[in-house]
């Protein structure tokens, strides 16, 4: 038995256990519950540890359309092994993004793996606006 499994057995009574599909996850019992009715949206850079740090990425690539898109070779990992910047909504990778620069604006081009809802797109727009404020530039969001 590995050290990790021994440690898990010794501390499991102090951990919160959650089973999703056929995978068991453990976490702190002190982790606050997620805020209901509020999405989290992140524009992650290429090679972010959220994807690169795990061999099994099924939890963050769980959507059927996302898996089909990725398996087609069109997204996330390019043929040269480079990871594309991804958009993550509520923990799931739902598209890729890239930035281009015009004379006056940063243009964020979003490629969706599956059609995002109106609420998701509104939240993405808010994140893109904050991105522009951080870089002190106006932003334009283009959606593929």
Question: For each predicted feature, which ranges?
Answer:
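Long, charged, low-complexity, helical-prone intrinsically disordered regions
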Residues: 1-144
């Amino acid at each position: 038995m590995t050290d990790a499994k021994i440690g898990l057995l010794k501390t499991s009574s102090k951990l919160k256990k959650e089973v999703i599909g056929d995978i068991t996850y453990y976490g702190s019992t002190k982790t606050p519950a997620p805020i209901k009715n509020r999405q989290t949206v992140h524009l992650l850079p290429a090679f972010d540890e959220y994807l690169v740090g795990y061999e099994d990425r099924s939890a963050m690539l769980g959507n059927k359309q996302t898996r089909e898109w990725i398996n087609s070779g069109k997204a996330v990992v390019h043929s040269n092994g480079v990871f594309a910047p991804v958009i993550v909504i509520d923990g799931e990778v739902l598209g890729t993004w890239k930035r281009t620069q015009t004379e006056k604006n940063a243009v964020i081009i979003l490629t969706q793996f599956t059609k995002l809802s109106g609420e998701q797109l509104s939240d993405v727009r808010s994140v893109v606006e904050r991105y522009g404020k951080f870089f002190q530039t106006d932003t334009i969001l283009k959606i593929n």
